[in-house]
Amino acid sequence: MTIEAIIAMQACARIGLTHSVVFGGFSSKSIQERVMDAEAKLIITADYQFRGGKKIPLKNIVDDAIAMGGCTSVQNIISLQRTKEDISLNPDDILWSDLIKNQKDECDPVFVDAEHPLFILYLSLIHI
């Protein structure tokens, strides 16, 4: 997990958005299912994740999940570019670096009801 992921989670909490952290090892199908279930409007991802000496193409996996269909709620994808490789951007994609360029130093909080969900956490269940 990157510092930008922590920033994104905290920013969501600050402005009253529900977030869901998805394990980087999930398949496109698993991501598609979670996006559809949560009716996600925004996806924040990175071009790659490095785990166990391997480079995992997160942005490509997200693009594949969206291409499967059914993720009609998604309006934008924000991508953190961690490598110097070209990143495949779709028309509605935004680079993290472009997004934060002109942001203010402070952001007023958005107040929500006490019952408003802070996050959605998906677990893998083992059936015995």
Task: Report residues per predicted region.
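Short helix-terminating capping/connector loops at secondary-structure junctions
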Residues: 70-74
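Conserved AMP-binding/adenylate-forming
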Residues: 1-32
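Conserved small/polar residues in nucleotide/adenosyl-binding loops
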Residues: 123-128
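Conserved ATP-dependent adenylate/AMP-binding module captured primarily in the ANL superfamily
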Residues: 26-69
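Short acidic/polar active-site loop segments enriched in Thr and Asp
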Residues: 18, 41, 75
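Flexible, active-site-proximal loop/turn residues at the rims of small-molecule/cofactor binding pockets
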Residues: 49, 83-84, 105
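Conserved pre-ATP/AMP-binding loop-to-beta segment of ANL
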Residues: 75-79, 88-122
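Conserved residues at the C-terminal ends of beta-strands
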Residues: 46, 80-81
